């Protein structure tokens, strides 16, 4: 079975971690890593024998056989890349908060949006918390959802820091659009503690039907689904009910592919993005009669 060729734009922390995950994939071929300067990430890819370029999106557009493109740059660059990739007939998996296309959280709504040419991976906080809000909403009705994502300062590179406002806005909106909450709010905290902390997310949901047994069963089932592509995802505080307010907390340990294990915040979004790409690649293989 021929693998589906993919490219990564943006050879930073997220792009490099994506590269290692793609190299392990049974369905994806890492065909190109591209950036705009001769960075460490570009050198790293070249050492692994991967084709590289410092011509950014232009290099991707020149490669007709690349079908799926991961954009790990930033919100503003992706707004420029998106129409170019669409015009070239390439599927864009957007790991920035640009949100040109619909939000996708693999365990919640991939089947509904997989035909779209541009899929947005929300944010790391969104991938960690939207499924829990969705799980609570489907059995109890979520009037309001608020999440606090606490990540190690060391795991936040320049791209993450430049996109803090977009992070909070995009995550809050995804709590509503994908999670099902009537109103959502997101807060991010960069914790400079040494040794660095694991990504920790606290989720507060005001519910219409406070049935704790149904809520716990729904959340536990969802956690198992997430663990199928993010093995380091853990429910550290099972849902607690106080009146009509549910509190839960999850922790994410990274796989340690490229980033340290405390960078679970980055690992969850790269793992989710690769899970999406693998599903799309399998469908492309069937469609093109390659499988």
Curated annotation (Swiss-Prot):
Q: Which residues form a coiled coil?
A: none
Report whether NAD shows up as a keyword of the record: yes
Instruction: List UniProt keywords, sorted A-Z.
Output: Aromatic hydrocarbons catabolism, NAD, Oxidoreductase
What are its E.C. numbers? Answer: 1.2.1.10
Keyword check for NAD, yes or no. yes
**Which residues are responsible for catalysis?**
124 (acyl-thioester intermediate)
The EC class name is oxidoreductase
Q: Give the catalysed reaction(s), semicolon-separated.
A: acetaldehyde + NAD(+) + CoA = acetyl-CoA + NADH + H(+)
Q: Which Pfam families match?
A: AcetDehyd-dimer, Semialdhyde_dh
Biological process GO terms, please? catabolic process
The residues that the entry says bind NAD(+) are 155-163, 265
Q: Which family does it belong to?
A: Belongs to the acetaldehyde dehydrogenase family.
Specify the protein name: Acetaldehyde dehydrogenase
Species of the source:
Moorella thermoacetica (strain ATCC 39073 / JCM 9320)
């Amino acid at each position: 079975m021929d693998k589906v060729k993919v490219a990564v734009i943006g050879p930073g922390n997220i792009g490099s971690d994506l590269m290692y995950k793609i190299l392990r994939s049974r369905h994806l071929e890492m065909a190109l890593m591209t950036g705009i300067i001769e960075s460490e990430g570009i050198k790293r890819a070249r050492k692994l024998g991967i084709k590289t370029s410092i011509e950014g999106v232009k290099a991707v557009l020149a490669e007709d056989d690349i079908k799926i493109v991961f954009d790990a740059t930033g919100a503003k660059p992706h707004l420029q890349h998106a129409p170019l990739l669409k015009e070239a007939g390439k599927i864009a998996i957007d790991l920035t908060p640009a949100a040109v296309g619909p939000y996708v959280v693999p365990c919640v709504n991939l089947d509904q949006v997989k035909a779209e040419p541009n899929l947005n991976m929300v944010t790391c906080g969104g991938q960690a918390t939207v499924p829990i809000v969705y799980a609570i909403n489907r059995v109890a009705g979520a009037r309001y959802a608020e999440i606090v994502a606490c990540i190690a300062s060391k795991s936040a590179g320049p791209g993450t820091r430049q996109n803090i406002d977009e992070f909070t806005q995009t995550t809050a909106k995804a709590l509503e659009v994908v999670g099902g909450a009537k109103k959502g709010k997101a807060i991010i905290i960069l914790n400079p503690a040494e040794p660095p902390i694991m990504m920790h997310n606290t989720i507060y949901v005001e519910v219409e039907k406070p049935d704790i047994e149904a809520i716990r069963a729904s959340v536990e089932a969802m956690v198992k689904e997430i663990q199928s592509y993010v093995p380091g995802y853990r429910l550290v505080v099972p849902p607690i009910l106080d009146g009509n307010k549910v509190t839960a907390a999850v922790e994410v340990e990274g796989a340690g592919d490229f980033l340290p294990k405390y960078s679970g915040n980055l690992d969850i979004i790269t793992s989710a993005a690769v899970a999406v790409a693998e599903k799309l690649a399998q469908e492309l293989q069937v469609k093109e009669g390659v499988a």
